[in-house]
């Protein structure tokens, strides 16, 4: 599977001068209804309404509703309909912003009232009325900023966007951007009178009837422009699709995603928690979660050792000047925790005898790794030098964006920094990408595409020439992999471009996993050198790489990917013996002892629960192997297997049972064992 293609799947057509794009679409015989209806056109990379009229003959790409771009436009238009419904039912509400987002949309409102589920039901009803009316989306351009300000005098949040054009470069601000200030009127299809309007740069679908299926999903509190220092707002989320069938499939996916939510499973399976006493975004792993985490780390550690990485360890805090040298304090200070001022010495009268220093919790490991590299002279014979650490870092995330294990404030990165020569650079990047993809596949994630994040023109260090060389090198390595490469303009860190490995989970959702960043700037800032073969001193090229992203995030993704039913080799408890009666417990204890002797995490349930209750309990805990024993099993020297899918195999000789479990775990299979897969009683 590849990344979603946002572009049109329809062949280009020509729009004659003075003719609307919609007319050209109809004359070309392209559909105007259904899930493949043309909703907008693309002109030189920009999306335009079907009412757009070119001044000269122009070739355009028709964009269908069932493409990513088509859905995005439908969702943006649905956000407008939502805002119209809110202002009809809650006239006091002031408009914020309402962008399309992945699989949906939202709109922020300045209102003291917190929307209830009953409110969402009423809003959906009102939206359906507006959609049924078929109101036309009509674009008009303001002749001046003053004209826009006059019309929006009662909309303070819109006025802010108009007055300073803030958000012109923000993809979530659809109100302003480009060379014009424009608004969209919702027009009554019979009278042509305006029913409602909103500041917006567009584009939009032709009429509200082009929103075939939608649902409001939830509401929450928010801050204007996501800044806690700004006004508090109420946000309503929704989703919209090109057909009822597509919406139904998405809602089913949402229900399954809720069942797989790692925050919910973390509690049910006793894996981790977020105690209030510790703080937001700071998880603690319980014994069972600790086992899963250790298995993740141990396997990764072994693979890194085999690949020639050298393990290092660095402290959690450092002096301020280290991050001044690296540039983090200039470019990343918003993501860092406040400094700790320590080591000051005072005289008895309170005057300073020795000034203190600022220390920071480290947000990244790389500066400390550079100091390890620089601790002694380096030769070209040592390169590539691959330094690796499971390093704890701390990043200040706003409380509103902290989310379970996937967005935390304290995390452990499987962080590597590779120092190589320019001549080795391409080969090292190629082998590194292969290593990353292979290791992720070993954990059961094997559906990938790549993103190439390039320079943010407002936030970078180094010369344009260096950035261009680094970007071209990464692009070539990515293309050589054969995976789809999706551009991410302006998405790079301040010190270099990066490749991001995007992995799809069992529900088809994309997660950013590994990042590979090429950096020519940091070696210069830290004066990193090596002695070349000709005796001259040269600077190495630096490759930053985090394979999991963070252990916490990877743990959360795998929990949802497997719905808590981890592969047997990762499962906290791999086998549980369930005696039919108390008298059978000693027999199962012997079998469990055999399993433990071969490294299997096994136990016997000797609780007072009835056998059926024990089976239900351990099935709900996603234990991959349940071993049942009664009188016949004891007499025959056998056990009965019970699997996660509730199938059962009876009368398996105990030695064969032990061997089958040990073999399955050691083979690191990433699917749940079943009677069919285990092939009990069958020879190889």
UniProtKB/Swiss-Prot annotation:
- What's the cofactor? Zn(2+)
Disulphide bond pairs: none
Keyword terms: Aminoacyl-tRNA synthetase, ATP-binding, Cytoplasm, Ligase, Metal-binding, Nucleotide-binding, Protein biosynthesis, RNA-binding, tRNA-binding, Zinc
Report any one BP term from Gene Ontology. Answer: threonyl-tRNA aminoacylation
Residue ranges constituting the TGS domain according to the UniProt record: 1-64
Catalytic reaction list: tRNA(Thr) + L-threonine + ATP = L-threonyl-tRNA(Thr) + AMP + diphosphate + H(+)
Q: Where in the cell is it found?
A: Cytoplasm
Region of interest: Catalytic: 261-567
Which EC numbers does the record give? 6.1.1.3
Q: HAMAP family under this entry?
A: Thr_tRNA_synth
The subunit field of the Swiss-Prot or TrEMBL record says: Homodimer.
Q: What is this protein called?
A: Threonine--tRNA ligase
Q: What gene is behind this protein?
A: thrS
